[in-house]
Amino acid sequence: MHKDIKIVDASAIVKPTGTPYVVYFSSISNNTHRFIEKLEFEHTRIPVNLDEQIEVNQEYVLFCPTYSGGGEYTSGAVPKQVIHFLNNKHNRDLCRGVISSGNTNFGNTFAIAGPILSKKLNVPLLYQFELLGTKNDVEQVQTIITNFFGKAK
């Protein structure tokens, strides 16, 4: 198991209430953005420009792509924009879970931003997908988030 993976104790998990809501970062490539659009949940995008700040006011699941990786190299895996967003305690306190994307070419650091954020925020890592994700990934994530928010179909 990679050193950045931490098992979150089930008793520590705070499940969100209300309407499923996601916050995400996507670079100008828009890979994560395209995935989010397919989910059809309410969402807010973390700005690419570090000078722009946003604040959310409801519980959410954070989607984060992974930058860097390979072997034990994890420095820079979480985009600076996501770190900037989470430096706001109010934003950080409303995060209830994490989903990350990455490239399987990076081996055991595939989508490592998810485990890093899960460990740091003490929230569950709900799912990981590769690059743009597949139709199956979209369906799985829709089910996971719907159930996580207690809105089972």
UniProtKB/Swiss-Prot annotation:
GO biological process: protein modification process
Purpose of the protein: Probably involved in ribonucleotide reductase function.
Species of origin: Mycoplasma pneumoniae (strain ATCC 29342 / M129 / Subtype 1)
One Pfam family from the record: Flavodoxin_NdrI
Gene: nrdI
Record-given protein name: Protein NrdI
Family: Belongs to the NrdI family.
Recorded GO MF terms: FMN binding
